[in-house]
Protein backbone atom coordinates (compact mmCIF):
# COMPACT_ATOMS: atom_id res chain seq x y z
CA UNK A 1 0.00 0.00 0.00
CA UNK A 2 2.84 2.34 0.86
CA UNK A 3 4.52 1.79 -2.53
CA UNK A 4 1.21 2.33 -4.28
CA UNK A 5 0.69 5.58 -2.40
CA UNK A 6 4.20 6.75 -3.27
CA UNK A 7 3.68 5.91 -6.94
CA UNK A 8 0.36 7.72 -6.93
CA UNK A 9 1.93 10.77 -5.30
CA UNK A 10 4.75 10.70 -7.85
CA UNK A 11 2.30 10.45 -10.74
CA UNK A 12 0.29 13.33 -9.33
CA UNK A 13 3.47 15.41 -9.02
CA UNK A 14 4.40 14.89 -12.67
CA UNK A 15 0.81 15.46 -13.78
CA UNK A 16 0.72 18.81 -11.94
CA UNK A 17 4.13 19.73 -13.36
CA UNK A 18 3.00 18.94 -16.89
CA UNK A 19 -0.26 20.84 -16.37
CA UNK A 20 1.64 23.92 -15.23
CA UNK A 21 4.48 23.96 -17.74
CA UNK A 22 3.07 22.47 -20.95
CA UNK A 23 0.98 25.59 -21.72
CA UNK A 24 4.24 27.55 -21.50
CA UNK A 25 6.53 25.04 -23.19
CA UNK A 26 4.34 24.21 -26.19
CA UNK A 27 3.98 27.82 -27.49
CA UNK A 28 7.74 28.23 -27.00
CA UNK A 29 8.47 25.11 -29.03
CA UNK A 30 6.04 26.17 -31.75
CA UNK A 31 7.64 29.62 -31.91
CA UNK A 32 11.10 28.08 -32.14
CA UNK A 33 9.96 25.77 -34.94
CA UNK A 34 8.39 28.64 -36.87
CA UNK A 35 11.58 30.70 -36.42
CA UNK A 36 13.70 27.82 -37.74
CA UNK A 37 11.39 27.40 -40.74
CA UNK A 38 11.58 31.13 -41.50
CA UNK A 39 15.36 31.08 -41.11
CA UNK A 40 15.71 28.15 -43.53
CA UNK A 41 13.36 29.77 -46.04
CA UNK A 42 15.22 33.09 -45.93
CA UNK A 43 18.60 31.32 -46.12
CA UNK A 44 17.48 29.62 -49.34
CA UNK A 45 16.29 33.01 -50.54
CA UNK A 46 19.92 34.23 -50.46
CA UNK A 47 20.81 32.05 -53.43
CA UNK A 48 21.52 34.22 -56.47
CA UNK A 49 21.34 37.51 -54.56
CA UNK A 50 23.85 40.25 -55.38
CA UNK A 51 25.76 41.15 -52.21
CA UNK A 52 28.12 44.14 -52.07
CA UNK A 53 30.53 43.89 -49.13
CA UNK A 54 32.84 46.75 -48.15
CA UNK A 55 36.03 46.03 -46.25
CA UNK A 56 36.08 42.64 -47.99
CA UNK A 57 39.88 42.45 -48.26
CA UNK A 58 40.43 41.06 -44.75
CA UNK A 59 38.95 40.23 -41.36
CA UNK A 60 35.19 40.13 -40.95
CA UNK A 61 34.57 41.35 -44.50
CA UNK A 62 36.58 38.46 -45.91
CA UNK A 63 34.75 35.99 -43.66
CA UNK A 64 31.41 37.43 -44.79
CA UNK A 65 32.48 37.03 -48.41
CA UNK A 66 33.06 33.30 -47.80
CA UNK A 67 29.72 32.90 -46.02
CA UNK A 68 27.68 34.69 -48.68
CA UNK A 69 29.58 32.91 -51.47
CA UNK A 70 28.79 29.52 -49.92
CA UNK A 71 25.13 30.58 -49.72
CA UNK A 72 25.11 30.95 -53.51
CA UNK A 73 25.28 34.74 -53.66
CA UNK A 74 26.82 36.89 -56.38
CA UNK A 75 29.48 38.50 -54.22
CA UNK A 76 30.96 41.92 -54.97
CA UNK A 77 34.23 42.40 -53.07
CA UNK A 78 34.88 46.07 -52.27
CA UNK A 79 37.89 47.65 -50.54
CA UNK A 80 40.83 49.96 -51.23
CA UNK A 81 43.49 47.27 -51.69
CA UNK A 82 42.95 45.66 -55.08
CA UNK A 83 45.73 43.09 -54.56
CA UNK A 84 44.06 41.82 -51.38
CA UNK A 85 40.70 41.69 -53.12
CA UNK A 86 42.32 39.54 -55.82
CA UNK A 87 43.62 37.22 -53.11
CA UNK A 88 40.18 36.89 -51.52
CA UNK A 89 38.59 36.25 -54.91
CA UNK A 90 41.16 33.54 -55.66
CA UNK A 91 40.58 31.93 -52.26
CA UNK A 92 36.83 31.88 -52.80
CA UNK A 93 37.17 30.13 -56.14
CA UNK A 94 39.82 27.66 -54.94
CA UNK A 95 38.49 26.81 -51.49
CA UNK A 96 34.93 26.39 -52.68
CA UNK A 97 35.60 25.00 -56.15
CA UNK A 98 32.84 22.40 -55.81
CA UNK A 99 30.19 24.93 -54.85
CA UNK A 100 27.86 25.73 -57.77
CA UNK A 101 27.84 29.50 -57.50
CA UNK A 102 28.77 32.74 -59.24
CA UNK A 103 32.33 34.09 -59.72
CA UNK A 104 32.85 37.09 -57.43
CA UNK A 105 33.74 40.46 -58.90
CA UNK A 106 36.18 43.03 -57.53
CA UNK A 107 35.30 46.66 -56.85
CA UNK A 108 38.22 48.89 -55.77
CA UNK A 109 36.52 51.38 -53.46
CA UNK A 110 37.75 54.13 -51.15
CA UNK A 111 34.97 55.09 -48.74
CA UNK A 112 36.67 58.41 -48.03
CA UNK A 113 36.30 59.43 -51.70
CA UNK A 114 32.63 60.35 -51.53
CA UNK A 115 32.46 61.69 -55.08
CA UNK A 116 33.48 58.32 -56.57
CA UNK A 117 30.89 56.20 -54.77
CA UNK A 118 27.94 56.82 -57.09
CA UNK A 119 29.95 55.71 -60.12
CA UNK A 120 31.14 52.58 -58.33
CA UNK A 121 27.57 51.56 -57.54
CA UNK A 122 26.53 52.22 -61.13
CA UNK A 123 29.28 49.91 -62.39
CA UNK A 124 27.91 47.07 -60.24
CA UNK A 125 24.37 47.73 -61.48
CA UNK A 126 25.61 47.57 -65.07
CA UNK A 127 27.12 44.13 -64.41
CA UNK A 128 24.46 42.51 -62.23
CA UNK A 129 21.41 44.71 -62.76
CA UNK A 130 20.77 45.00 -59.03
CA UNK A 131 22.30 45.13 -55.58
CA UNK A 132 20.12 43.05 -53.30
CA UNK A 133 22.16 43.34 -50.11
CA UNK A 134 24.64 46.04 -49.13
CA UNK A 135 26.96 45.17 -46.26
CA UNK A 136 28.55 48.31 -44.79
CA UNK A 137 31.56 46.68 -43.14
CA UNK A 138 34.52 48.86 -44.10
CA UNK A 139 35.97 51.12 -41.43
CA UNK A 140 38.95 52.17 -39.33
CA UNK A 141 39.54 52.66 -35.62
CA UNK A 142 41.62 54.99 -33.46
CA UNK A 143 43.51 54.74 -30.18
CA UNK A 144 43.92 57.98 -28.26
CA UNK A 145 42.25 60.30 -25.76
CA UNK A 146 39.89 62.95 -27.10
CA UNK A 147 42.06 65.99 -26.37
CA UNK A 148 45.22 64.53 -27.92
CA UNK A 149 43.44 63.33 -31.04
CA UNK A 150 43.94 65.76 -33.90
CA UNK A 151 40.71 67.06 -35.40
CA UNK A 152 41.87 65.76 -38.80
CA UNK A 153 41.82 62.25 -37.33
CA UNK A 154 38.28 62.76 -35.98
CA UNK A 155 37.22 63.90 -39.44
CA UNK A 156 38.88 60.95 -41.16
CA UNK A 157 37.23 58.42 -38.83
CA UNK A 158 33.80 59.97 -39.41
CA UNK A 159 34.44 60.23 -43.15
CA UNK A 160 35.20 56.53 -43.57
CA UNK A 161 33.03 54.95 -40.88
CA UNK A 162 29.97 57.16 -41.24
CA UNK A 163 29.83 59.44 -44.28
CA UNK A 164 31.32 56.84 -46.64
CA UNK A 165 28.82 54.19 -45.59
CA UNK A 166 25.94 56.68 -45.70
CA UNK A 167 26.93 57.81 -49.20
CA UNK A 168 27.15 54.20 -50.38
CA UNK A 169 23.78 53.40 -48.82
CA UNK A 170 22.16 56.39 -50.52
CA UNK A 171 23.69 55.36 -53.85
CA UNK A 172 22.24 51.83 -53.54
CA UNK A 173 18.77 52.78 -52.32
CA UNK A 174 17.14 54.14 -55.52
CA UNK A 175 17.46 50.83 -57.40
CA UNK A 176 16.27 48.91 -54.33
CA UNK A 177 13.27 51.21 -53.97
CA UNK A 178 12.42 50.85 -57.65
CA UNK A 179 12.35 47.05 -57.26
CA UNK A 180 10.62 47.21 -53.85
CA UNK A 181 13.24 44.88 -52.42
CA UNK A 182 16.62 45.11 -50.71
CA UNK A 183 18.52 44.96 -47.47
CA UNK A 184 21.07 47.27 -45.84
CA UNK A 185 23.35 45.55 -43.33
CA UNK A 186 25.58 47.86 -41.31
CA UNK A 187 28.35 46.45 -39.15
CA UNK A 188 28.54 48.74 -36.15
CA UNK A 189 30.05 47.86 -32.76
CA UNK A 190 29.07 47.56 -29.12
CA UNK A 191 30.87 50.92 -28.94
CA UNK A 192 27.94 52.27 -30.92
CA UNK A 193 25.79 51.33 -27.92
CA UNK A 194 28.08 52.71 -25.21
CA UNK A 195 31.33 54.67 -25.41
CA UNK A 196 34.64 53.81 -23.75
CA UNK A 197 37.74 55.97 -23.07
CA UNK A 198 40.35 56.47 -25.81
CA UNK A 199 37.82 55.57 -28.52
CA UNK A 200 35.90 58.86 -28.77
CA UNK A 201 36.04 59.25 -32.55
CA UNK A 202 35.39 55.58 -33.24
CA UNK A 203 32.50 55.41 -30.77
CA UNK A 204 31.04 58.62 -32.19
CA UNK A 205 31.09 57.20 -35.72
CA UNK A 206 29.34 54.03 -34.58
CA UNK A 207 26.74 55.95 -32.54
CA UNK A 208 26.05 58.00 -35.67
CA UNK A 209 25.56 54.84 -37.73
CA UNK A 210 23.15 53.47 -35.13
CA UNK A 211 21.03 56.62 -35.36
CA UNK A 212 21.15 56.69 -39.17
CA UNK A 213 20.03 53.06 -39.44
CA UNK A 214 17.21 53.53 -36.93
CA UNK A 215 15.86 56.48 -38.92
CA UNK A 216 16.39 54.81 -42.29
CA UNK A 217 14.68 51.57 -41.21
CA UNK A 218 11.44 53.42 -40.54
CA UNK A 219 11.63 55.47 -43.73
CA UNK A 220 12.22 52.64 -46.22
CA UNK A 221 9.91 50.03 -44.68
CA UNK A 222 7.17 51.11 -47.11
CA UNK A 223 9.45 50.03 -49.98
CA UNK A 224 10.07 46.56 -48.51
CA UNK A 225 13.69 47.42 -47.75
CA UNK A 226 15.09 45.89 -44.58
CA UNK A 227 17.77 47.46 -42.39
CA UNK A 228 19.86 45.27 -40.10
CA UNK A 229 22.37 46.75 -37.67
CA UNK A 230 24.99 44.41 -36.21
CA UNK A 231 26.90 45.44 -33.07
CA UNK A 232 29.72 42.95 -32.43
CA UNK A 233 32.08 42.92 -29.50
CA UNK A 234 35.79 42.38 -30.06
CA UNK A 235 36.64 40.27 -33.12
CA UNK A 236 40.07 38.77 -33.75
CA UNK A 237 40.95 40.86 -36.81
CA UNK A 238 43.59 43.42 -37.74
CA UNK A 239 41.37 46.34 -36.67
CA UNK A 240 43.73 47.48 -33.91
CA UNK A 241 46.82 46.84 -36.07
CA UNK A 242 45.36 49.12 -38.75
CA UNK A 243 44.05 51.69 -36.26
CA UNK A 244 45.29 55.26 -36.12
CA UNK A 245 46.84 57.05 -33.19
CA UNK A 246 45.67 60.49 -32.15
CA UNK A 247 48.27 62.03 -34.48
CA UNK A 248 47.12 60.00 -37.47
CA UNK A 249 50.07 57.60 -37.40
CA UNK A 250 49.61 53.84 -37.55
CA UNK A 251 48.90 52.26 -34.16
CA UNK A 252 50.39 48.99 -35.39
CA UNK A 253 49.71 46.86 -32.31
CA UNK A 254 47.36 43.99 -31.57
CA UNK A 255 45.27 44.75 -28.50
CA UNK A 256 44.86 41.90 -26.04
CA UNK A 257 41.08 42.31 -26.16
CA UNK A 258 41.11 42.15 -29.96
CA UNK A 259 43.39 39.11 -29.98
CA UNK A 260 41.02 37.35 -27.60
CA UNK A 261 37.93 38.31 -29.55
CA UNK A 262 35.48 36.17 -31.46
CA UNK A 263 36.57 34.56 -34.70
CA UNK A 264 35.57 36.39 -37.91
CA UNK A 265 34.10 33.14 -39.25
CA UNK A 266 31.80 32.62 -36.25
CA UNK A 267 30.74 36.26 -36.38
CA UNK A 268 30.01 36.05 -40.10
CA UNK A 269 27.90 32.94 -39.51
CA UNK A 270 25.92 34.74 -36.81
CA UNK A 271 25.35 37.70 -39.14
CA UNK A 272 23.92 35.47 -41.88
CA UNK A 273 21.62 33.89 -39.30
CA UNK A 274 20.48 37.36 -38.21
CA UNK A 275 19.70 38.20 -41.84
CA UNK A 276 17.83 34.91 -42.29
CA UNK A 277 15.78 35.70 -39.18
CA UNK A 278 15.10 39.21 -40.50
CA UNK A 279 16.47 40.74 -37.30
CA UNK A 280 16.75 44.50 -37.08
CA UNK A 281 19.28 45.25 -34.33
CA UNK A 282 21.63 42.54 -33.10
CA UNK A 283 24.34 42.65 -30.44
CA UNK A 284 26.91 39.88 -30.96
CA UNK A 285 28.90 40.10 -27.76
CA UNK A 286 29.73 38.17 -24.59
CA UNK A 287 28.26 38.98 -21.19
CA UNK A 288 30.62 41.83 -20.19
CA UNK A 289 29.71 44.22 -23.06
CA UNK A 290 26.04 43.32 -22.67
CA UNK A 291 26.25 44.13 -18.97
CA UNK A 292 27.95 47.45 -19.78
CA UNK A 293 25.15 48.30 -22.20
CA UNK A 294 22.44 47.72 -19.60
CA UNK A 295 24.49 49.41 -16.90
CA UNK A 296 24.76 52.53 -19.09
CA UNK A 297 20.96 52.75 -19.23
CA UNK A 298 19.86 51.37 -15.87
CA UNK A 299 22.65 52.59 -13.57
CA UNK A 300 24.49 55.34 -15.47
CA UNK A 301 26.32 56.67 -12.40
CA UNK A 302 27.92 53.27 -11.85
CA UNK A 303 28.80 53.03 -15.55
CA UNK A 304 30.40 56.50 -15.53
CA UNK A 305 32.46 55.60 -12.46
CA UNK A 306 33.73 52.41 -14.12
CA UNK A 307 34.65 54.33 -17.28
CA UNK A 308 36.44 56.97 -15.19
CA UNK A 309 38.56 54.24 -13.58
CA UNK A 310 39.26 52.75 -16.99
CA UNK A 311 40.37 56.14 -18.31
CA UNK A 312 42.67 56.65 -15.31
CA UNK A 313 44.31 53.30 -16.01
CA UNK A 314 44.77 54.09 -19.71
CA UNK A 315 46.13 57.56 -18.97
CA UNK A 316 48.76 56.13 -16.62
CA UNK A 317 50.21 53.75 -19.21
UniProtKB/Swiss-Prot annotation:
List of catalytic residues: 202
Record-level Gene Ontology MF annotations: oxidoreductase activity
GO cellular component: membrane; peroxisomal membrane
Cytoplasmic side: 1-10
UniProt-listed Enzyme Commission number(s): 1.1.-.-
Cystine bridges: none
Keywords, comma-separated and alphabetical: Membrane, NAD, NADP, Oxidoreductase, Peroxisome, Signal-anchor, Transmembrane, Transmembrane helix
Peroxisomal topology ranges: 32-317
Residues holding NAD(+): 52-76
Keyword Oxidoreductase on entry: yes
Positions annotated to bind substrate: 189
Localization: Peroxisome membrane
Top enzyme category: oxidoreductase
Predominant location: membrane
Membrane topology reported for the UniProt record: Single-pass type II membrane protein
Domain of life the protein comes from: Eukaryota
Keyword Cell inner membrane: no
Transmembrane segments: 11-31
Family statement: Belongs to the short-chain dehydrogenases/reductases (SDR) family.
Role, per record: Putative oxidoreductase.
Name of the protein in its database record: Dehydrogenase/reductase SDR family protein 7-like
